[in-house]
Curated annotation (Swiss-Prot):
This is Homeobox protein Hox-B3. The keyword Transcription applies. Residues 63-124, 136-195, 249-276, 389-433 are annotated as: Disordered. Residues 191-250 bind DNA. Residues 151-182 have a biased composition (Gly residues). Sequence-specific transcription factor which is part of a developmental regulatory system that provides cells with specific positional identities on the anterior-posterior axis. Keywords: Developmental protein, DNA-binding, Homeobox, Nucleus, Transcription, Transcription regulation. GO terms for biological process: angiogenesis; anterior/posterior pattern specification; cartilage development; definitive hemopoiesis; embryonic skeletal system morphogenesis; face development; glossopharyngeal nerve morphogenesis; hematopoietic progenitor cell differentiation. Residues 79-94 have a biased composition (Pro residues). SMART domains: HOX. It is found in: Nucleus.
Amino acid sequence: MQKATYYDNTAAALFGGYSSYPGSNGFGYDGPPQPPFQAATHLEGDYQRSACSLQSLGNAAPHAKSKELNGSCMRPGLAPEPLPAPPGSPPPSAAPTSTTSNSNNGGGPSKSGPPKCGAGSNSTLTKQIFPWMKESRQTSKLKNSSPGTAEGCGGGGGGGGGGGGGGGGSSGGGGGGGGGGDKSPPGSAASKRARTAYTSAQLVELEKEFHFNRYLCRPRRVEMANLLNLSERQIKIWFQNRRMKYKKDQKAKGLASSSGGPSPAGSPPQPMQSTAGFMNALHSMTPSYDSPSPPAFGKGHQNAYALPSNYQPPLKGCGAPQKYPPTPASEYEPHVLQANGGAYGTPTMQGSPVYVGGGGYADPLPPPAGPSLYGLNHLSHHPSGNLDYNGAAPMGPNQHHGPCDPHPTYTDLSSHHAPPQGRIQEAPKLTHL
């Protein structure tokens, strides 16, 4: 036994310098790392240890000498460790083992018992950490290659709570990939779970279910999990991600419609303005209304027909119901009502709405007491069928044609105008006349 320890000790003492000196440079991997300040004392300490071990083994010295040898061996090595070296007075066979253990602890990288145990424990600890991480990566690769497996790292052990939190994070941030599967949470290594790759059949079923209702009740979720060979949690997270994606799509559609919206939505006000003002079917003829001739037209008729002033209040009453304020119609209508109201408002036309040359259709005029009230005897003989709405009504020989001649174009253009919205219901009656 002494020979075996002797050979081990001498080998450790002689070759310890060579095995531990690269360790100080960082290249040795036989044992635990050494502090750098021992690098200069390794060679001297190893030779002194070899001498100490040879002397102690060869001479079988008494206890005091072995204690001195222990102290001399420990001085170049680790300074704070001579206390456990001389406990009591061991027998001479125990002294060299204590020196060898101390020398091994001082020198470090040798192949005897205690350092090997320490290195083994460290290696087992590292093996407990690193291969576990390798396994998690391999399982993630396996999951990506073979989808449909429901077990993940986050579901096992103590990672359940962290996995739940990760599910919330994935539902918040992983909306873009809702069709593709779950997002792995960015955080803790303890609850790393792999991205679930769904098959096309699973995605079709999930999309179908999402199409019918976006929120899934728990019994239906359990049924879907059994049907698709997924876990409830995966289906829940898929639905969360899919809802986020749906919300994003709706936002994008809303922005697109609002950006393209003003052109179609802004175009209807143009016909609305035309209905409120003119109801013009031929937009190219609207500039003819800008001519200042209608007031002269009305005044000429006033002079020709010699309408008294008491005729104006009922005509103003007729013009009052028009609530639309566009300037051409409101400016021209009172004059034309004053001018043409008596001309076309003959008793033969009382049953139909009266067409007024300038501004559209007015209500039927109140029946006059007689044709002679306004001096319109010459118009009492004309039936309503002879009236055309181009301003060229058949006129009696007493009538002055002068003021009427320059303006047939104005009245012709006015015939294309439909009534204001208040009188729309009366329009078809006159179109058939």
